[in-house]
Regions:
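A short, highly charged nucleic-acid-interacting micro-segment common to nuclease
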Residues: 6-16
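An alpha-helical support segment within catalytic cores of ATP-dependent transferases
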Residues: 14-33, 98-102, 109, 125, ...
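Short, surface-exposed alpha-helical segments at coil->helix boundaries
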Residues: 18-22, 73, 254, 258
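Short glycine/proline-enriched coil/turn segments at helix->beta-strand junctions
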Residues: 33, 51-55, 250-253, 266
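Helix-rich C-terminal or lid/interface subdomains of diverse kinases
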Residues: 42, 129-133, 235-241, 246-317
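Active-site acidic catalytic loop and adjacent metal/ATP-binding pocket
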Residues: 44-51, 57, 194-243
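Short beta-strand segments
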Residues: 58-60, 94-95, 154, 208-211, ...
Length: 317
């Protein structure tokens, strides 16, 4: 999630019937004698299905989404080999075009399913002694990939925190939303947000970044409690490495986030932690506002604020 809510962004300009999903699955993966197709959910851009818990199919919700899938195909051609040594998998996305007889208008994304459950959402007993160094190593190698390897992909360059794009301008709306709860525990959040100023552009070396490393995009092994994969790279950009740390405190807290920073082993400028704190605080409040525009279930977003701000917001649950 890299920008604020609008109904149009969640809309779909085509129909998708389950019969079409079956036809496309049979075309995309021939010789499927027996199979089970499961609907996994829908996001900004795609309706997502799995086949036998072995393959992922992503169906664009709008024509404009095709360019996002094409971007992921290009990015994955660099990421898959570069990150193989980390033991953290990334989707090896390919595009396939359904035959005209199926009646689905767009190409779809397909890739081998990465095992694991979404971090911070499904309750998992974490193995921090494995998760922390493995995640730090993943981020270190990711941010060490030479940016010229992405030069032909026309990625955006961001000298400010891209995760806050669209939210900075909505500061007054976010403040009004926080006031609406009339919960004293949120006063510290309101006071900080009311007085904070936008960060100056980052002047250091830019890296390739995931740029939306929210908990749902990190997969963890439910049995062993460690990271298995990172998905949804459509917001990938050349930017400030801090961007990929901002959402870690949402679900692992500050102590474990700082332990990842300590194990990261790439040079950090003297404002790294300041930008990390600013981004985490602002984005946690923005996520609450954003989700409230379309859902009454704000339990995850409230939990994020509790972890980032170290508050008890049980009155909101």
């Amino acid at each position: 999630m890299s920008s604020s809510y609008s109904p149009e962004r969640w809309s779909s300009d085509r129909d998708l019937r389950f019969g079409q999903v079956i036809q496309i699955a049979e075309e995309a993966i021939p010789n499927l004698k027996q199979y089970e197709i499961s609907y996994l959910g829908s996001g900004w851009c795609n309706d997502v299905y799995s086949i036998n818990n072995n393959w992922i199919l992503r169906f664009p919700r709008r024509e404009e989404v095709i360019t996002h899938l094409q971007k992921e195909v290009s990015i994955s051609s660099v990421l898959v080999p570069a990150l193989e040594e980390t033991g953290v998998l990334v989707p090896d996305v390919k595009l396939t075009t359904p035959s005209p007889s199926v009646g689905f208008p767009y190409p779809i994304g397909i890739y081998p399913m990465i095992k694991g459950v979404s971090a911070g959402i499904d309750p998992v007993e974490m193995n921090w002694t494995d998760f922390i160094p493995k995640t730090a190593n993943f981020l270190r190698i990711l941010h060490s990939i030479p940016v010229d390897q992405f030069k032909d992909f026309h990625l955006p360059t961001q000298e400010t925190l891209g995760c806050l794009e669209g939210f900075i301008e909505m500061k007054e709306d976010i403040l009004s939303h926080l006031h609406s709860y009339e919960v004293k525990s949120l006063d510290v959040c309101v006071e900080w947000l009311d007085s904070c100023e936008p960060l100056p552009p980052f002047s250091g070396d830019l890296s390739f970044i995931h740029n939306d490393l929210a908990p749902e995009h990190i997969l963890v092994d439910p049995e062993f409690g460690t990271i298995t994969g990172v998905i949804d790279w459509e917001d990938g950009a050349i930017g400030d490495p801090v961007s990929d740390f901002v959402t870690l405190p949402f679900w692992i807290g500050w102590e474990n986030t700082f332990r990842i920073c300590d194990s990261y082993s790439l040079p950090m400028d003297d404002k790294f932690l300041c930008r990390l704190e600013y981004g985490s605080k602002f984005l946690s409040l923005a996520y609450l506002y954003d989700e409230a525009q379309r859902s009454n279930d704000l339990s995850s977003q409230i939990s994020f604020i509790e972890n980032v701000w170290e508050l008890d917001l049980s009155l909101l649950k």
